[in-house]
């Protein structure tokens, strides 16, 4: 048997100085392969490389293999399906997916949609649907699949064949308001019984899938889930890998040995505007990255029509040419047809041109790529699900817009293609041999064979063997018993002389929860390498830090009470300096009721500045996912985290939280407020299973905490309650505060009374956003029911009859407290921390941002003057008396 020269090695390193010696070495390896197999050959080669390096030879490491399929023809398993029937089913789905998008855009070009992405990946999905992806049943938890967002039309088209969606549903693709429509992309919020995971914007799916696979192992290790052979599949595009989130976490699943994780990257070589790597090879680039990280890499580049040509490639010229061509050329080979490919690919060497001399231009154009060959794809999937010890990535080469012909196949404009004319549609029909008439093409009629047809029976039988229809999503599970408010008694009582922060109050609440025999095992504490910052190190010993391998070393602080304890059954997810990954773990835990049929309750605590601001897109996806859990913004408040300065001081997380519709945001000052909020959150999310989540800002400032006032719990949850009533007086002001600035508000009330004889009522506002949410809802109802009795919002009802003016101060931007201006029954002045943060002590910072007690008092006096309660000279005298510089620059400009 002739042995081909190895490429690209010789193609890039010059001529072989001793071909005879080279041939002897190659024949030796051939002999080992024949007699002892590939594993022995691999072992010998590794030993030789190691020996050469130890002997002083410089051997640069290359993580790339030849530009060929990883699985040779001889190692492909038998295909278990009927390819004839499967081709027809795939063709019907292709047609219906295309018709759905074109139909919508015939109505209006506003709707958009994507044809080309699913066209390139249809075979990748169909092999999975027919042979691999198990739906959840009573006996098996089911596989989890992150579908590439732009391929949603194909998933809908399959569901239509299965009878899960109707023709009316398809007709209302991307029209969810006016009819029974389908969401543009996978959105559990919009289709809660269909889609499991939101995968757009691009790049979110890969990281979420990684942490989902790890969380599955976490649940198994802790005995919450039975150990099963479930897999997490993630589909993404080659262009999508440019997103930092797509590649940023790929070393973690190798460390964790997540062989339950499979990535399928659809390498159609094109992104939205043009080639992904026109001057290079994206498959080789991705192979190097994943191989270097330690993944099992399977390349599916060439379809079966190339196999005979490769078998005849005795001199290695075909493989050499495959290596030499860049992706921009490969795109042209499919866009410009067989004659072009004959000239520019096979025409590089006379021997190659002779190899295809008996092939027509059409034959050459039909030389297929691996991602469109079900047998090659099945071989890759089969190898992936059976691989042990490492995650697998499958790099499947496809053609973007496959089947669209001149309308968009392999063309740069194909991603934006929403419409096809009648001739294009006929060409598509003929190419896939669809039983669709010219009249049906004009009408864009969907095709669905009869229920007793061979195809429909096959389609349903395959899914029945895999547990049922897919995708599918659970919406409710058995509720857990939630502790009553009295459970948190220690935080509801006065602390006396003891001073501590709301962060420490949270840690005590969390510690009590993990100790509870009922709900405790389902609590999932998540920290991004800040447990000691937040005073949580006591939990290290108590519940342990999860580690898939346990603890293989003696920790440096093993002689301490709170030593760093890692354990296979550890409860804490210690994610390192990694807010994106931490949040993905939070999503995995917060959706476990749906993905795994068991409730877990994540508590993710982090520097508040590095939350929504850092991973806002993931936070939005968390809301879309219907995640349930708690986000704790630690060291919150622009002046409360004093010395850390500009990049750390958070003055807007409470505002950003309001942008996510199902997020409930609170800014408590006292331990009892925090306890009331967390207990009610558990009740709503865990017992009543509402699809909401909580953002709570907690601080690192120590002070004494009073007891829960009688009757205050309802006001705490609704957003505000009266904390202290001022004495009698002709004039009066209402002071509102939240978080630690509430204490400055209380001090300002004392100052107003003591120095100026003006009493003040003080209100604790735990959530301006909840007050606004209620008020907007009431306003809307009143607007739509003009003849009904007018409803009154909670904030209006609470402040009705109060003698003003009203002054609000927070440690956040002024717009946070400004949210309720419309419903405050009097003059309303707001103070906040607009501007960049800076390093200094709390007193200095509060003076700088004008949220200290003196500034609050002056704001109150100024408002009284505007209302005619005091003269302006009184305000001027107060400014001088309190030592405030009226000419200092506005802090927002500094």
Predicted regions and their residues:
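Thiamine diphosphate
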Residues: 2, 19, 175-198, 204, ...
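N-terminal amphipathic, basic-rich helices that act as targeting or association modules
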Residues: 2-162, 428, 499-516, 520, ...
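Glycine- and acidic
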Residues: 11, 28-31, 78-86, 104-113, ...
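Generic, well-ordered alpha-helical scaffold segments in large soluble proteins
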Residues: 28, 32, 47-51, 92-99, ...
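Non-catalytic terminal/interface segments that mediate subunit docking, oligomerization
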Residues: 76-97, 118, 133-136, 143-144, ...
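Cofactor-binding active-site loop characterized by glycine-rich and histidine/acidic residues
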Residues: 81-93, 97-107, 114-256, 279-280, ...
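Beta-strand segments within the central parallel beta-sheet cores of soluble alpha/beta enzyme folds
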Residues: 138-148, 169-175, 225-235, 263-265, ...
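A structural-propensity feature for long, helix-poor, extended segments
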Residues: 234-235, 241, 617-638, 643
């Amino acid at each position: 048997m002739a042995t081909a020269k190895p490429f690209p090695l010789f193609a890039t390193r010059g001529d072989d100085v001793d071909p005879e010696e080279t041939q002897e070495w190659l024949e030796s390896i051939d002999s080992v392969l024949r007699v002892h197999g590939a594993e022995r050959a691999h072992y010998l080669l590794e030993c030789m490389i190691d020996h050469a390096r130890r002997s002083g030879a410089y051997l640069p490491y290359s993580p790339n293999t030849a530009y060929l399929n990883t699985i040779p023809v001889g190692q492909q398993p038998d295909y278990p399906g009927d390819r004839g029937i499967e081709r027809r089913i795939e063709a019907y789905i292709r047609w219906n997916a295309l018709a759905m998008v074109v139909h919508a855009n015939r109505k209006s070009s506003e709707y958009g949609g994507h044809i080309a992405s699913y066209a390139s990946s249809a075979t990748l999905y169909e092999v999975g649907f027919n042979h691999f992806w198990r739906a959840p049943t009573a006996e098996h938890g089911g596989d989890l699949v992150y579908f590439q967002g732009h391929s949603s039309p194909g998933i809908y088209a399959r569901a239509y064949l299965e009878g899960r969606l109707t023709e009316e549903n398809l007709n209302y693709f991307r029209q969810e308001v006016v009819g029974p429509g389908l969401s543009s992309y996978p959105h559990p919020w919009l289709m809660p019984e269909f889609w499991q995971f939101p995968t757009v914007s691009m790049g979110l799916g890969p990281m979420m899938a990684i942490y989902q696979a790890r969380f599955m192992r976490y649940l198994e290790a802790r005995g919450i889930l039975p150990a099963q052979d479930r897999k997490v599949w993630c589909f993404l595009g080659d262009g999508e890998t440019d997103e930092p989130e797509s590649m940023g976490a790929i070393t973690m699943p190798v460390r964790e040995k997540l062989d339950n994780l499979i990535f399928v990257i659809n390498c159609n070589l094109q992104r939205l505007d043009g080639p992904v790597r026109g001057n290079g090879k994206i498959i080789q680039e991705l192979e190097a990255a994943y191989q270097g990280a330690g993944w099992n890499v399977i390349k599916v580049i060439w379809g079966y029509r190339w196999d005979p040509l490769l078998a005849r490639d005795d001199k290695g010229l075909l493989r050499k040419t495959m290596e030499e061509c860049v992706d921009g050329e490969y795109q042209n080979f499919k866009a410009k047809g067989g004659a072009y490919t004959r000239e520019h690919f096979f025409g590089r060497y006379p021997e190659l041109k002779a190899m295809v001399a008996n092939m027509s231009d059409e034959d050459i154009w039909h030389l297929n790529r691996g991602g469109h060959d079900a047998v090659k794809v099945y071989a890759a999937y089969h190898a992936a699900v059976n691989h042990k010890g490492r995650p697998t990535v499958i790099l499947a080469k496809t053609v973007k817009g496959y089947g669209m012909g001149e309308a968009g196949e392999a063309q740069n404009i194909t991603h934006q293609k929403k419409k096809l004319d009648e001739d294009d549609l006929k060409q598509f029909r003929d190419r896939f041999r669809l039983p669709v008439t010219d009249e049906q093409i004009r009408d864009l009629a969907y095709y669905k064979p009869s229920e007793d047809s061979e195809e429909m029976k096959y389609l349903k039988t395959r899914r029945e063997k895999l547990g049922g229809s897919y995708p599918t999503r659970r919406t409710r599970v058995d509720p857990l018993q939630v502790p009553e408010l009295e459970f948190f008694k220690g935080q509801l009582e006065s602390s006396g002389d003891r001073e501590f922060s709301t962060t420490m109050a949270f840690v005590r609440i969390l510690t009590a929860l993990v100790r509870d025999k009922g709900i405790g095992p389902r609590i999932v504490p998540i920290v991004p390498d800040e447990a000691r910052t937040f005073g949580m190190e006591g939990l290290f010993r108590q519940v342990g830090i999860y580690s898939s391998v346990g603890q293989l070393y003696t920790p440096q602080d093993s002689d301490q009470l709170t030593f760093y304890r890692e354990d296979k059954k550890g409860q804490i997810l210690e994610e390192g300096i990694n807010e994106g990954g931490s949040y993905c773990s939070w999503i995995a835990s917060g959706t476990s009721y749906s993905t795994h049929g068991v409730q877990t309750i994540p508590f993710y605590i982090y520097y508040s500045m590095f939350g929504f601001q850092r991973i806002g897109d993931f936070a939005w996806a968390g809301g879309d996912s219907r995640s349930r859990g708690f986000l704790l913004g630690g060291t919150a408040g622009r002046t409360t985290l004093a010395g850390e300065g500009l990049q750390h001081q958070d003055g807007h997380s409470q505002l950003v939280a309001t942008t996510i519709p199902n997020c409930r945001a609170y800014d408590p000052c006292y331990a009892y407020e925090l306890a009331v909020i967390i207990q009610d959150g558990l009740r709503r999310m865990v017992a009543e299973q509402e699809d909401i989540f909580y953002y709570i800002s907690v601080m690192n400032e120590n002070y004494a905490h009073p007891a829960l006032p009688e009757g205050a719990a309802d006001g705490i949850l609704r957003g505000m309650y009266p904390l202290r009533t001022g004495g009698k007086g002709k004039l009066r002001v209402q002071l509102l505060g939240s978080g630690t600035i509430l204490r400055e508000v209380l001090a300002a009330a004392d100052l107003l009374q003591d120095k100026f004889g003006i009493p003040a009522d003080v209100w604790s506002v735990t959530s301006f956003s909840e007050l606004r949410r209620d008020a907007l809802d009431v306003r809307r109802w009143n607007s739509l029911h003009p003849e009904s009795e007018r409803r009154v919002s909670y904030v209006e009802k609470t402040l009705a009859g109060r003698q003003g003016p009203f002054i609000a101060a927070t440690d956040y931007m002024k717009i946070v407290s400004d949210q309720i201006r419309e419903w405050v029954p009097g003059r309303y002045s707001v103070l906040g921390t607009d501007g960049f943060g800076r390093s200094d002590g709390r007193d200095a910072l509060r003076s700088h941002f004008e949220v200290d007690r003196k500034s609050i008092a002056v704001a109150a006096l100024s408002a009284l003057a505007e209302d005619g309660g005091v003269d302006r000279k009184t305000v001027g005298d107060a400014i001088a008396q309190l030592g405030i510089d009226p000419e200092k620059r506005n802090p927002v400009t500094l």
